[in-house]
Regions:
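Short small-residue beta-strand/loop micro-motif enriched in glycine and branched aliphatics
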Residues: 88-90, 145-148
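Ribosome large-subunit tunnel/peptidyl-transferase-proximal elements
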Residues: 23-119
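Generic detector of short, well-ordered, non-transmembrane alpha-helical segments enriched
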Residues: 18, 48-49, 132
Length: 165
């Protein structure tokens, strides 16, 4: 009897552990439609405890966010992370700027690429790594014109029609 209770507790602890690190992927579907994406980078995020809990629950959005350089550091702005209901009495701004964790060589490389006119850094994917930390994939992007977007839609429709045949 006692052994059965111990195995039930162990299995519950294992499932709780796996639920804590379930794969969470929050995508920016607008990015590939609005921009030409070239180079992709991955960086960690500086977050508070309640913010990482909201991200693990899938309550975040990166559709309208962008990255900017300030004082030799890269920051992501306008990224929405919902307030965690059990966070306590300290309210957090859901759209505050968050620092990206990058090495100095990566920051210099990105800064050179972004100096061109019309080039920016756009977040494409927010995910929780197997280590439990939140990571942000972002790309060097150049804006598309309206005729480029229409051409992309036509190509997508043609490929869909060909796959049906």
């Amino acid at each position: 009897m006692e052994a059965q209770v111990l195995t039930e507790r162990a299995s519950f602890q294992m499932t709780a552990h796996y639920l804590r690190f379930m794969p969470v992927e929050i995508k920016n579907k607008k990015a590939s439609y609005t921009y030409f994406l070239t180079d992709e980078f991955t960086a960690g995020l500086v977050l508070s405890g309640s913010e990482i809990k909201s991200i693990r629950a899938g309550k975040a959005s990166i559709t309208e966010s962008y990255c900017r350089f300030e004082n030799g550091e890269v920051w992501v702005l306008n990224m929405y992370v919902a307030e965690y209901p059990n966070a306590g009495y300290m309210p957090q701004d859901p759209r505050r700027k968050r620092k990206l964790l990058l090495q100095k060589t990566e920051i210099k490389k990105l800064n050179k690429k972004v100096k061109d006119v019309g080039v920016t850094l756009v977040p494409t994917l927010l995910f929780v790594a197997p280590s439990g930390y939140a990571k942000l994939k972002f790309s060097v992007a150049k804006g598309k014109k309206l005729h480029d977007k229409r051409e992309a839609i036509k190509n997508r429709d043609v490929s869909r029609d060909l796959s049906k045949i």
